[in-house]
Design a protein with these regions (language model features):
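Short, charged N-terminal beta->alpha structural module
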Residues: 1-46
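Bergerat-fold GHKL ATPase/HATPase_c domain
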Residues: 50-141, 152, 156-169, 173-177
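Residues that cap or initiate secondary-structure elements
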Residues: 24-25, 110-112, 198-200, 260
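Short, conserved beta-strand edge motifs with alternating hydrophobic and charged residues
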Residues: 140-143, 205
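Conserved beta-strand-loop-beta-strand hairpin that lines the nucleotide-binding pocket
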Residues: 95-101, 152-265
């Protein structure tokens, strides 16, 4: 099956954003930045980010330290640099940061080798001053389910039912190794976007580059009494204020109540 990419970024989509990081000279970084609507890239952040300085996105190899650093101000997120540079970055990444949110774009391989959910959950709690408690815990559980679905069922296209039995789980592990050895599937991106849209709530969107799925049909299927496998969408639906799918089922958008630690004290 051919790869279905996240929507391409439109030219000049987000002026006022700058990419920071060491880039491969084999491709024209600044031309790719311009195509994304980014200011010319820089190898390091400005010494003194004033009011006129653009919002910063960190780019480079996906390591725990670079991702953690990218989720800490002055940065607004991380874009993993692939073999083709910035090609394939989804439009939602740029739009989210432009709107004041936080974003990440990683390949499936990298997403399987770093504690992605933990890194994102910590950053969300810190950036939104999210109060600890049940809501924060449910958010992290939903994030874990959505990320797992995006990687396994979306980008790697591994069926739900394989993990339903011990024998099936052995097959699942073998198939996963094979899919991650496939350069096309392994390079598909998972993208995570966090945005406080209105007082009292924030959205968490997880995008993949797989074939997509029918959210309503999948929720109905998992609700059956004899269902033995699924994507955990019933749990997500119960934990979220709202749940929607976009981009032909390749993006899951979850809305959560937002109570800051200050408000809850």
């Amino acid at each position: 099956m051919t790869s279905t990419a996240c929507p391409d970024v439109k030219p000049n989509a987000a002026p006022g954003l700058r990419l920071v990081g060491s880039m491969n000279r084999m491709w024209d970084v600044d031309r790719q930045c311009a195509a994304l609507g980014l200011a010319p890239h820089s190898t390091s952040p400005p010494d003194d980010a004033g009011a006129e300085e653009p919002t910063l996105l960190l780019a480079g190899p996906a390591t725990i330290e670079t991702i953690r650093h990218s989720l800490t101000p002055p940065y607004a997120g991380f874009l993993e640099i692939g073999s083709d540079g910035l090609t394939g970055i989804g439009q939602r990444c740029i739009e989210t940061v432009r709107a004041g949110g936080m974003t990440l774009s990683l390949t499936a391989t990298s997403a399987c080798t770093v504690p992605l959910v933990e890194l994102i959950a910590v950053a969300i709690r810190r950036r939104l001053a999210l109060a600890t408690g049940e809501n924060a815990e449910l958010m992290e559980i939903c994030l874990a389910e959505a990320v797992s679905n995006a990687i396994i069922h979306g980008n790697l296209e591994i069926p739900n039912h394989l993990r339903a039995t011990p024998k099936g789980f052995d097959t699942f592990r073998q198939v996963m190794r094979e899919r991650l050895s496939d350069p096309v599937m392994a390079s598909r991106r998972i993208e995570i976007h966090v945005l406080a849209r209105q007082p009292g709530s924030f959205t968490l969107a997880v995008s993949d580059q797989g074939p997509g799925f029918d959210l309503a049909a999948q929720i109905k299927k998992e609700a059956r009494a004899d269902a033995r496998s699924g994507r955990g969408l019933g749990l997500i639906r119960r934990a979220c204020a709202t749940i929607e799918s976009e981009d032909g089922g390749r993006t899951l958008v979850m809305t959560f109540p937002w109570e800051s630690a200050t408000e809850g004290s």
